[in-house]
């Protein structure tokens, strides 16, 4: 049993004497972003744009330097104060077998470039969203996170700057990446080149990310791993809000520039300077301090069983995660999820292997009816936080406060967070993938078949209650005046606010053939894929079909040619324009393997490659079935008749065209 506690940040603590250094490659070019760590600790740094780093270490520490595509470097620290480190390229990666295009291929025999990240690089910190663990770990992949709300903090992913519509293929099935726990992932491969994307059809026009999950191993004793992780999230670079006295002075200055008289007289400025959020006439509310904490908690626990015998291998995983929030005035802002997965693979005879993978995820996102950023729209002097306690019919004071609002700013977001109710967004996901692999070498040497069937169902239900608070405004003449839109409504029970169900069915069949002799290598294949997606909430149904043929030829691993031809169709278009043909081709020349390069030792691998082709795109104008009319009813028609009755009418919502088809990129 391996029990480990991981920190939330791999670089959190430094000690001892300071050393500096530079990391370069064999040509002397600085390596940007190399990891420099004291082995076995969390003490580390990352090289800057000039390949330089600084780090506090102690004598006897073992320094480890690593970067993707290069061999790791280790050095024991003595009395050095400056280090010059040269990393050598990992040429073994050229012989690495990588997943690409529903199959595998040697990295060195590709006419394009791919990037891969391993599972251990994704689990250095607990994150509520799996996508967030990819930031900065894959070249060509841009991760942008725009929210830190628990359960809504997923980053958007762009491959080589394209739109955030890259698809995720998990064990051959397209799905939402966030439905897979990072600890279940074996590796992730990013496909960015034309040929690699073409093999996955029109849905991969913006790129594809291939995820392989852990499967266990044959003839491997059972291993049990227990991981516990904890961390703290810190709100970074939140803008400062102006306080009441600052707001009043800037308002007066702006009015003076425009030729208006001052709105806030010295008496008001003196009142705002007291910084009293409950002052009836001169409130000064510090919403940031009232609303936000400086940190939020993160924790994760996971248990994994894996192993296998001669005929069967298995992997079972159970994970739980909790993320708090930085919001103070709502007890219902947090996110938790539970994930369980099981993978079984068995050899049936000499030529057959079957597998079944099941994954289920249950998540709960609790939130109030407001967010912290809503406070930015309300000046600190708009109204007092509360105006005291409300009174019952008998004149007795009730527990419900009277919250302040104004005629201009009619929403007290502090009150809305406390008294406005809450909702819980519950997401349930179930995924089942089954596959059969046939070795047909008894029929034709090098011939293989793979059949895959996948079913995914996603259900989102939002349960909660929407309530109201008692809102009043202060006037100098009338005292307290009621705002009729805030009635103090309370509800005894919760109800279903919304529901959404999505179901996907995928079928995949591939025949592949490999042949090699006398320096010649051929890899060929034919693939049929069908994807059905049904939104059961509104009966929206879509289907995609495509057939792909691909062939790759390599001579002495120096000269490489690839061809891909695909015939793809989508139900989004009229039957006469649903299908289209997309050819692609690629060439590569591994110059470093030529005889005239043997004496140039500072170059380990040099490849010249190019690709050209067409890729389809189905997501046109954001809506399917543009060849069909879409009607709606309205009641704001013409006033007709003696009684001036306004009639109802029906009208189309869009122009109909029979000629829209796939984009060709």
Name each region found by the language model.
Residues 1-340, 353-355:
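Short, small/polar-rich motifs associated with maturation and membrane association
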Residues 8-10, 237-240, 368-370, 464, ...:
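Short aromatic-enriched loop/helix-cap "lid" or pocket-rim segments at secondary-structure transitions
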Residues 122, 164-165, 343-352, 357-362, ...:
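Extracellular/periplasmic, surface-exposed regions of secreted and cell-surface proteins
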Residues 126, 130, 156-158, 198, ...:
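Localized chelating/binding microdomains
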Residues 229-233, 366, 610:
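Short, solvent-exposed aromatic-acidic interface loops
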Residues 262-285, 300, 375-413:
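Acidic, glycine-rich flexible loop segments
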Residues 365-377:
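Low-complexity intrinsically disordered tracts that form flexible linkers/tails across taxa
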Residues 471-473:
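Active-site-proximal polar cores
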């Amino acid at each position: 049993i391996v029990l480990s506690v991981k920190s939330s940040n791999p670089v959190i603590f430094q000690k001892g004497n300071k050393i500096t250094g530079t990391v370069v490659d064999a040509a002397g070019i600085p390596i940007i972003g190399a990891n420099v760590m004291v082995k076995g600790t969390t003490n580390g740094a990352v090289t800057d744009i000039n390949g330089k780093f600084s780090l506090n270490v102690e004598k006897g520490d073992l320094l480890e330097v690593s970067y993707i595509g290069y061999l790791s470097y280790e050095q024991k620290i003595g009395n050095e104060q400056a280090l010059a480190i040269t990393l050598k390229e990992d040429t073994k990666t050229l012989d690495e077998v990588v997943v690409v295009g529903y199959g595998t291929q040697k990295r060195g025999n590709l006419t394009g470039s791919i990037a891969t990240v391993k599972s251990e690089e994704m689990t250095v910190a607990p994150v509520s969203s799996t996508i967030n663990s990819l930031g900065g770990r894959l070249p060509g992949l841009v991760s942008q996170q725009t929210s830190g709300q628990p359960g809504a903090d997923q980053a958007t992913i762009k491959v080589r700057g394209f739109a955030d519509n890259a698809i995720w293929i998990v064990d051959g099935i397209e799905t939402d990446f966030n439905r897979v726990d990072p600890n279940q992932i074996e590796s992730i491969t990013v496909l960015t080149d034309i040929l690699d994307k073409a093999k996955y059809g029109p849905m991969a026009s913006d790129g594809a990310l291939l995820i392989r999950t852990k499967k266990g191993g044959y003839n491997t004793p059972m291993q049990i791993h227990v991981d516990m992780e904890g961390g703290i999230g810190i709100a970074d670079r939140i803008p400062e809000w102006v306080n009441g006295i600052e707001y009043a002075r800037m308002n007066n200055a702006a009015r003076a520039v425009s030729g208006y008289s001052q709105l806030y007289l010295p008496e008001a400025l003196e009142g705002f300077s007291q910084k009293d959020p409950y002052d009836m006439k001169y409130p000064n509310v510090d919403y940031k301090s009232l609303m936000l904490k400086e940190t939020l908690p993160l924790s994760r626990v996971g248990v994994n069983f894996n192993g296998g015998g001669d005929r069967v291998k298995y992997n079972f995983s159970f994970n739980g995660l909790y993320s708090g929030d930085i919001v103070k005035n709502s007890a219902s802002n947090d996110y938790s999820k539970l994930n369980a997965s099981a993978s079984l693979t068995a050899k049936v005879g000499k030529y057959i292997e079957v597998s079944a993978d099941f994954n289920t995820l249950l998540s709960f996102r609790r939130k109030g009816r407001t967010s912290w950023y809503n406070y930015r729209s309300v000046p600190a002097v708009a109204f007092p936080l509360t105006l005291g306690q409300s009174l019952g019919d008998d004149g007795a004071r009730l527990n419900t406060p009277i919250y302040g609002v104004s005629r201009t700013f009619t929403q007290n977001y502090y009150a809305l967070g406390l008294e406005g109710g809450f909702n819980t967004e519950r997401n349930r996901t179930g995924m089942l993938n089954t596959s059969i692999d046939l070795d047909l070498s008894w029929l034709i040497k090098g011939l293989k078949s793979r059949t895959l069937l996948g079913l995914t169902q996603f259900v989102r239900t939002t349960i909660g209650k929407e309530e109201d608070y008692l809102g009043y405004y202060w006037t100098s003449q009338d005292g307290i005046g009621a705002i009729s839109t805030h009635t103090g409504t309370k509800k005894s029970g919760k109800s279903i606010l919304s529901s959404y169900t999505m179901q996907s069915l995928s079928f995949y069949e591939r025949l592949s053939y490999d042949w090699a002799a006398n320096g010649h290598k051929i890899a060929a294949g034919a693939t049929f894929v069908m994807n059905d997606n049904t939104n059961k909430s509104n009966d929206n149904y879509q289907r995609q079909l495509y057939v792909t043929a691909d062939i790759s030829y390599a001579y002495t691993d120096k000269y490489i040619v690839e061809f891909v031809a695909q015939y793809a169709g989508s139900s989004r278009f009229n039957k006469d324009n649903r299908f289209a043909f997309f050819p692609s081709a690629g060439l590569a020349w591994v110059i470093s393997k030529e005889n005239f390069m043997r004496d140039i030792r500072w170059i380990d691998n040099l490849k010249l490659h190019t690709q050209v082709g067409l890729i389809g795109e189905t997501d046109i104008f954001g809506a399917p079935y543009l060849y069909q009319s879409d009607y709606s009813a309205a009641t704001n028609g013409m006033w007709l008749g003696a009684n001036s009755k306004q009639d109802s009418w029906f009208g189309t919502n869009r122009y109909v065209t029979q000629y829209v088809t796939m984009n060709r990129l």
